[in-house]
Design a protein with these regions (language model features):
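N-terminal alpha-helical targeting/anchoring segments
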Residues: 1-145, 160, 164
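TRNA-recognition modules of translation machinery and tRNA-sensing kinases, especially anticodon-binding
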Residues: 27, 141-440
């Protein structure tokens, strides 16, 4: 969400940004929102003029009332009363005009704010330009991709060897897109989550368990309407939504708040279940636990000074790389192009893990800088040392999403005999186990 003043003063820049995001259908919205802003400001100015006129008339009535009270001449009294009545009629007409102007202002402002939610955030100048994720750019690789000399089964087949997953039972209970994890696979899932939590605590982040349901105004504050419709489950009859990621409730924690500047940055890491509709057709490689309606995730968010957000963005995606490399999983950083950025994002990158089975990388983390978009929507402000208020920047990144992390772990640590090596970093969370041995 952009500042209306910025749009008013830089309409061509805003339109160029829309073109860079390949959203040309939104170009007319810039002129529409400027026209609505003009209508709104015109109503405000007219209202101020009417208010001044009303005050002038009301002030004029004071002396007239005084003279009327002291006057003995009937003709003069009648004349004074007539002036007072005329002034009162003018004040009444003024009030009626004020009411109409307030309605005009409110309607223009509501329509303007609705359009402001649709106009995308200005992207960072470093973002590569392209229409979709096929134009995302590989930046750097970390770790040597593995090419085993034995076939690697699909991840659910590996899990089934340990009696670790039951997709059929979950389908009977909940439908497609759900799973039961059991035994060592379930323990591995919990180990990954706990390791991610402790990893971020060691980086200085505060551990947080947030609400798993949030109000609609928080949802609208953290994501676009398009993303909201595609992702969020609404609780019927309640102003509550199940979170799609704990970023939503962690950022929402600061709604309508004024933070002292010396309390920045706010750095939180949280665990939560996540619930997503995941609309649309999914490819054959997105079966199993890859793309599901319910999963668990460790997340990180930062609320910081605007001048610090680029440095935090760099730190945050590197935390992801460090975590995956500590588990001996090769990864790469992929810079998201303009057309692949969600409307609230200034800049974003994916961290992708190596799949020995597919001999290619797949997404496991997403790191984003949202500039002041969420802060503006949620009315999160900071009071600087000079006493002035400003909007902070917000960032988020996946620490670890165990379903996809499990895929990467199992494939990269599978042995020819069917066993799976437990990375040293996870062994304390697995009761000291160094290897998982298949049951059949």
């Amino acid at each position: 969400m952009l500042d209306i003043k910025f749009i008013r003063e830089n309409p061509d820049l805003v339109k160029e940004n829309i073109r860079k995001k390949f959203q040309n259908a939104k170009l007319p919205l810039v002129d529409e929102v400027i026209a609505l802003d003009s209508e709104r400001r015109e109503a405000i100015n007219e209202g101020e003029a009417l208010k001044a006129e009303r005050n002038k008339i009301s002030k004029a009535n004071g002396p007239l009332f005084g003279r009327l009270k002291k006057c003995a001449d009937e003709a003069e009294k009648a004349a004074l009363q007539a002036k007072i009545d005329a002034n009162n009629a003018a004040v009444k007409a003024n009030a009626e005009r004020m009411t109409r102007l307030e309605e005009k202002k409110a309607n223009a402002e509501a329509a303007m704010n609705k359009l402001l939610l649709v106009i995308p955030q200005m992207i960072d100048e470093s973002v590569p330009i392209g229409p979709d994720d096929s134009c995302n750019v590989e930046v750097e690789r970390f770790g040597e991709p593995k090419t085993p000399d034995f076939p690697i089964p699909y991840h659910t087949e590996i899990m089934e060897r340990f009696d670790g997953v039951d997709m059929d039972a979950a389908a009977r209970v909940s439908g497609n897109g759900f799973y039961y994890l059991m035994g060592d696979i379930a323990r591995l899932h919990s180990a990954v989550t706990a390791y991610g939590r402790d990893f971020m605590i060691d980086k200085g982040f505060t551990y947080c368990i947030p609400p798993f349901m949030i109000h609609g105004n928080v949802v609208e504050g953290v994501m676009s309407q398009t993303d909201m419709d595609a992702m969020m489950y609404k609780i019927e009859g309640e102003d509550l939504y199940l979170i799609g990621t704990s970023e939503h409730s962690m950022i929402g924690k600061f709604i309508d708040q004024i933070l002292p500047e010396d309390k920045l940055p706010q750095t939180l890491t949280s665990y939560s279940p996540c619930f997503r509709k995941e609309k649309g057709a999914h490819g054959i490689e997105e079966r199993g636990v890859y793309r599901i309606h319910q999963f668990e995730k460790q997340e990180m968010i930062v609320v910081c000074k605007p001048e610090d957000s680029k440095a935090w963005y760099e730190k945050m995606w590197r935390y992801s790389v460090e975590l995956f490399r500590s588990l001996d999983i090769p990864v790469r950083q992929l810079e998201c192009c303009s057309g692949d950025l969600a409307d609230l994002k200034c800049k974003s990158c994916d961290i992708e893990a190596w799949s020995p089975r597919q001999q290619k990388y797949f997404e496991v983390c997403s790191c984003s800088n949202l500039g002041d978009a969420q802060a503006r929507r949620l009315k999160i402000r900071v009071r600087g040392e000079d006493g002035k208020l400003y909007l902070p920047h917000t960032l988020n990144n996946t620490v670890v999403a165990p379903p996809r992390m499990l895929i990467a772990l199992l494939e990269n640590n599978l042995q020819a005999d069917g066993s799976v090596l437990v990375p040293k970093a996870l062994q304390p969370y697995m009761g000291g186990k160094e290897r998982l041995v298949p049951l059949h």
